[in-house]
Amino acid sequence: KASAYIFTNAKGYVTIMLPLVKQHKYHVIFYEEDGSELFRIKTIKDAELILDKTDFIHAGWFSFELFEDEKLKEKSKFFLSRD
């Protein structure tokens, strides 16, 4: 099931949508397909954040863990296509 919070938009960019960002503290960890950590965003302060494809180095499947107030809110994955 696709995430309602972290997904690729129509242009292929990774989008983070957190409508309750003012009420909660969020952070996210992105992983390679093999489970190794790629990078993390320690504090998300904007309701919408668009990440550049170059942040992910290559096309393919990536997984993530989204935390709300230090509790795991969602664990999912997305596919990032080539240009």
Predicted features and spans:
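Aromatic (tryptophan-biased) beta-strands that constitute blades/sheets of beta-rich domains
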Residues: 39-40, 74
